[in-house]
């Protein structure tokens, strides 16, 4: 179970990411300051929600989906789930709506159920890189760190300079006790976007690093 402190950080990360692109799936990471564990895929990746524009999975930007994204950005997860569900009722092949609902569901406390939706989104549109990021985040919330890292790596295969996927891997290594790798990846993220410094300095992933000389140099403590 995620502690209150961690959840607040996760929520902050997601909200910051969402601010970049508007939701969990059509967003841009590298230019925005985001918290590291709750960033939505859309924001963090900067890829459009669907790379297969002519497929059945093509996202229908209906009012329910737009409202769901807005609710997700505001931290109103129950409303985001409700609106995304309404969007899915209108279009059962709406990959983006499944991804938004999955991420909102995970942030609302049911990561296992959220993972079902993000997997469904992947089945509908396997080319949606934004959903790769959401998958990584949902796995992370569920505590499946190796699986989470694999999905961050899938994002980086498409966008090697994706700040928050690089940072996400850094936090995973930190949580797994791989200190050198954690700092190596943190350094990579900071080189891409220096705003990562303030995020890392505040997040509990790196709390035990606050007396580490290299960490202090990297984040400016």
Task: Give short role names for the model-derived ranges.
Residues 74-83, 107-120, 142-154, 177-185, ...:
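Structural signature of tandem alpha-helical TPR/SEL1-like repeats
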